[in-house]
Amino acid sequence: MNDKQKESSMIEGLKSYKRNIEAPWGLLFYRIIWDQLGQLKNKKILDYGSGFGVTANELAAQNDVTAIEPNKDMIKLRYKQNTYQQLVGTIESLKQEPNQKYDVIICHNVLEYVKDREALIAEFHRILKKDGFISIVKHNKLGKIMQKAVLEYKVEEVLTLLENRNVKSS
């Protein structure tokens, strides 16, 4: 596979992932997250690992949002109905930020891809205001299995996944 084919394949994969986000269960996930975050208004927010910018875009309606994402292809497909600052970057980008800059830091479905989690959390702590908070969401493999059963009605696929993982229900 040449570079152009690899890039095309990656873009198609990202488009498929974006369709999943826009499916009813993806929309439900985000509505639950936003409800748990509460009414944020006039806050300085960092969305680290912003992906397609779903959360950054939503929160930018009433807040000053900076989104950082390393994947340029995801940024090309991002949501941008509301105005927010989108940066291409990694933990190195955080090191350029001043101390205690953000009221809220969002880190959703990112930690599983970070090599040095301790360094990332230390940077979050440094740039978070004293009265601020961090919202962390991490993928849950068993949750994905339940999603297939409950939301996608793929019971046979779920049973196969459970058998292959030696997961038992009580």
Q: What are these model-derived regions, one by one?
A:
Residues V104-D116:
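A short SAM/SAH-binding and catalytic strip from SAM-dependent methyltransferases
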Residues F52-S93:
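Class I SAM-dependent methyltransferase SAM/SAH-binding core
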Residues K95-I105:
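A short acidic, Gly/Pro-enriched loop at the edge of an enzyme's catalytic core
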Residues E118-F133:
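A short glycine-rich, Lys/Arg-flanked "PGG" loop and its adjoining helix->strand segment in the class I
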Residues D47, E69, E112:
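Class I SAM-dependent methyltransferase core
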Residues M1-K41, K43-G51, V54-E58, M74-L77, F133-E163:
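Conserved class I S-adenosyl-L-methionine
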